[in-house]
């Protein structure tokens, strides 16, 4: 059960990241795609480290 929840949560975060990066790429087509998300351009960018820490804390 724990593994299923972790897999679903990871897939959800991956989809959020995919759509977030797509929206940012459309907003700034000249940006370097290998540079990663730009927190200044997108103040609501997903903080993956904080999410990973929360998942670790919740799932033990």
From Swiss-Prot:
One of its GO terms (molecular function) is toxin activity. Keywords: Amidation, G-protein coupled receptor impairing toxin, Mast cell degranulation, Membrane, Repeat, Secreted, Signal, Target cell membrane, Target membrane, Toxin. Its main location: secreted. Expressed by the venom gland. Belongs to the MCD family. Mastoparan subfamily. GO terms for cellular component: extracellular region; membrane; other organism cell membrane. AXPX repeats lie at residues 27-30, 31-34, 35-38, 41-44. Disulfide bonds: none annotated. InterPro entries: Mastoparan. The modification Leucine amide is found at residue 59. Residues 28-45 form a propeptide. This is Mastoparan. It comes from Vespa orientalis. The keyword Transit peptide does not apply. Mast cell degranulating peptide. Its mast cell degranulation activity may be related to the activation of G-protein coupled receptors in mast cells as well as interaction with other proteins located in cell endosomal membranes in the mast cells. Has a membranolytic activity on human glioblastoma multiforme cells (brain tumor cells) that leads to cell necrosis. Residues 1-27 form the signal peptide. It is found in: Secreted; Target cell membrane. It comes from the Eukaryota.
């Amino acid at each position: 059960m724990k593994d299923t929840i972790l897999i679903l949560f990871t897939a959800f975060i991956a989809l959020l990241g995919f759509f977030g990066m797509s929206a940012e790429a459309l907003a700034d087509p000249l940006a370097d795609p290998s540079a990663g998300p730009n927190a200044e351009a997108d103040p609501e960018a997903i903080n993956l480290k904080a999410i990973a820490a929360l998942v670790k804390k919740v799932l033990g």
